Regions:
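PLP-dependent amino-acid enzyme catalytic core
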Residues: 1-297
Length: 297
């Protein structure tokens, strides 16, 4: 396969639909809640993962690279998504994994990446941190690869995420923040009166700094559209407590889509609290972007 065609991926992207949902006692005359179902795109490269890879795949083809190389931790959904989509498109791929004490049998994610054909290379944390943001043409063991930074956090990833909310007419769009790639793409696409609510899932994550790094001068023009709810990380990445687990379980019992406690559960919890804290004179439409995160592995 020598050329990139958007049709290669569109059969998956069109599965993402928008529908209304409910939080008990929160859907009233002031709010209508909707969800963008990017979790339906694919069981392994679902959510924002394929969107962040879309234009990186185009760059791989345009630069006539040998393969794709990317970075991730031991439980990285980004590594899994990259391995899966490269398997689908028959593209050689390498995953640089944080932690030289690991191997491909350390967990089900890494094992599945290997099964899909991804060559895994395990680096010490210090060496990994030095190269995890590498992007663009990158020579590795004698071959030219297109390097995608950890989490897909590059310009190509941002542009792929712009498409999440194109042509939408919602007043507020709320999304999880891990690397700020998805939220940066959405911010670029907002219309004049739209605002975006971001919920960092990492403790101490500097949303404004990370988004400015990705967007450059464009960020200054758009930053007033941004609302940061940075108090709902529950202690940090993948950290939870009984209150969050109870909320997620109750939500999943009463809705026709699932959330989880690492990303989407924290966003939904934050949305619930935010609705309680605001008072608008006019009705508002809110879009919750479901970024996936459920791999069943």
């Amino acid at each position: 396969m020598s050329e990139f065609s958007y049709e290669m991926l569109n059969e998956f992207l069109i599965k993402s639909v928008i529908h209304e949902f409910y939080i008990p006692h929160k859907n009233d005359s002031k709010f209508k809640l909707f969800v963008k179902r990017d979790d339906l795109i694919h069981n392994e490269f679902s959510g924002n993962k394929l969107r962040k890879l879309k234009f990186n795949l185009k760059a791989y083809f345009d630069n006539r690279c040998y393969g794709i190389l990317t970075f991730g931790g031991a439980f990285s959904n980004h590594l899994l998504a990259t391995a899966s989509v490269c398997n689908y498109l028959n593209i050689p791929c390498i995953g640089i994994v944080r932690g030289d004490e690991l191997d491909l049998n350390s967990n089900s994610i890494l094992r599945r990446c290997s099964e899909l054909g991804m060559i895994l290379s395990f680096y010490s944390r210090s060496n990994f941190n030095q190269i995890k943001k590498t992007t663009g043409n990158y020579f590795f063991e004698g071959n030219q690869y297109w390097a995608v930074p950890e989490g897909g956090a590059n310009t190509e990833g941002v542009f792929g995420c712009r498409e999440i909310v194109s042509k939408s007419d919602f007043d507020f769009i709320i999304v999880a923040q891990g690397t700020a790639t998805t939220s940066s793409g959405i911010l670029l696409e907002l219309k004049e009166k739209q605002k975006m609510i971001v919920v960092p899932v990492l403790k101490g994550f500097d949303s404004l700094k990370e988004m400015k790094t990705l967007l450059g001068n464009e960020f200054e023009r758009l930053k007033d559209k941004l609302i940061v709810l940075d108090q709902f990380h529950f202690g940090g990445y993948a950290k939870t407590n009984s209150e969050l687990i109870f909320f997620v379980d109750k939500f999943n019992e009463t809705n026709n889509f699932q959330i989880e406690p690492v990303y989407t559960g924290k966003v939904m919890f934050a949305l619930n609290k935010w609705i309680e804290s605001v008072n608008f004179k006019e009705n508002k439409k809110v879009l919750f972007v479901h970024t996936g995160g459920l791999t069943n592995l």
